[in-house]
Amino acid sequence: MLWSAIPLLLATFFSASAALQLYRIISRSYRSRKLSKQWNCEPVTSYPSGLFGHKAVWRLKTAAQEGQVGSTLHEGHLQYGNTLKLNLVGHDVVVTCEPENIQALLASQFSSFGLSKWRYPQYRPLLGGGIFTSDGSAWEHSRRLLRPQFTKNQIPSIEWFDSHSKNLMQELPPDGHIFDIQPLAFRLALDSATGYLFGKSISSLVKPNSNQTGIAETSDRRNEGFAAAFDYAQDILFKRTLALSYYWLIDSSEFRKSTRVVHKFVEYYVDKAIEYRSKINSPGDSLEQKGGEYCFLHALAAETQDRDFLRDQLVNVLLASRDDVASVLTSIFYLLGRDSVAWRKLKKEVTDAVDNHASNITLKEIQSLPYLRGVLYEALRLFPPVPVNARVAHHDTTIPVGGGPDGRSPVFISKGQMVAYSVWCLHRRPDIWGADAERFRPERWEEYNPPAWDFVPFNGGPRACLGQQFAIILISQQVFRLVQHLDSVESAQPGPDMGLNPPLRQTLTMCHENGVQLRIKRSKG
């Protein structure tokens, strides 16, 4: 008798579940329409996504394979408006490149938006509970401890930066030889990041054959291959991001192995920092013993000696420090290699600065060079390290513009809905940057000072990049020294000229899919 009743019980259960789900959908739809009318919202243009979003998913997948995600989104905005809605695997996502909306997401409505509920489980295997995966009070705690470590007083001396410049110059090939600058940019960025964060650079530019990405001090060489593991893990994290709630389907033993390699690399330094803090905090130590050069990790370990917390924060900061710098530095030479006029102008400015200051030029004076600043900012405008980002609504709310026929009415955003913002598209809008928006023209930065939310290469608001000042100084100094010692830089990129839309590989940050092939000639003397 009991067994015969099971089908009926199951049918009743599934019917009730379906009815409950239908009720929730109808109730949510009614509430959304009511609030939308109350808040004077208008519908946003829909991108043709297909059933369950299969067309949009396929288009983005194809764009990613071709390295054209940024240009594909840009085409979509040009055709359907600066704010649009698309469906991704059943989720309605609003995508915008409006400055007012980006300001709302990152600053003016900061408390209404946060990270996706999937961000932590998506990123946890590599980034743990670091500042890029946390939200709310956990994020506030991380930022409170990390922010003091990025003050101007902690910026290293020009001699520190020059030591890395010399290592990079030694790795450049003979005049006339074709080489890819992107791997060198990543090694330079890794060396400078580990030197600043851990107090000791791994010097991958100095000994690329013996232990390029490992730690020489460890006898078992467990950390060899760190950079490759870091790159692979980031690639998987990006795929988990695109999968939204289905992130758990993207996993593998190789992915888990790569995260262990990264963690062991960082834990080596964390353990040394904790040991260092315990020694200098012992009763017999004098203040003099606590002196020495600034070390980010040692300073952070003075605030907490929680091993997992320190490791997670260091992995997060290392990711941003290495990848952002390498991305921008590579893009600068992609642009300069294609523009001999811009190269000659920059070369003259650098040569004049060296002649005027002899060997005593300072970091501040390097940063004050207008054309160098223009070159850097144009690279950040055209190739932002993080071209696309997103936030999720904590509750039913709105974004300022994007609705209605003219796109100027508020748009209703329901609780849990994702709003993606494209910095790539924002930075290439002709109505903001002029008819030559998709042209590399450093002079525009001497003629035009854009409003704050028209130019956001490092995000903005409370979650703005903490290390942006360090990154700008490092990139400016490295470009200055390379231009100083090189007479010419020419593009040697194979294949058809892709202009300002070369194939780009998007993980958590952006890099050039095919690298940046150059041919150089050193300056005489």
What spans do the regions from the language model cover?
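N-terminal membrane-proximal hinge/A-helix region immediately C-terminal to the signal-anchor transmembrane segment
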Residues: L2-H141, I155-P156, W160-Q170, L188, ...
